[in-house]
Amino acid sequence: IRRPPRSTPKPSSAASDVYKRQHIERLMILGNIMLLLEIDPKKVNKWFMELFIDSYDWVMVPNIFGMSQFADGGLMSTKPYISSSNYIQRMSNYAKGNWSKIWDSLYWQFIANHESKLVSNPRMSLMVNIYRKKTNQDKMEIKLLSESFKESIF
């Protein structure tokens, strides 16, 4: 999902910047979208291990399976590290746009897909209840947009 930045970022002076990302970028941007897309956590781990030069099993395995992809059933983290586009907008220079509609549809569809598990999670039950209050029309639009986006990239 690409969106022009609000301001022009300074060009990087280090070629290695491509292969390094700060932890929060990995967790809350890359990991977030991969979880919202419901990509197999083993594939997510493989991708991170192959792409980043500072990837080590002792760091990546707990970060991917325990935090980023919530694949350990909540042993390490109390909630999935997912967010709506609002978080991305607050933490970056990305403005609201078509990308945010797609991101939000993926977010709400993830909540719908895992509603029965998330409703008993104290940190996620509010979002489940917000989803439940959406109209049937809104839910259908969320589902259609999230499915069409997934089909366009897989």
Please identify what each model-predicted range represents:
Residues S16-F154:
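C-terminal catalytic domain of photolyase/cryptochrome flavoproteins
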Residues I1-A15, Y19:
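Single conserved hydrophobic/aromatic residue that forms the stacking wall/gate
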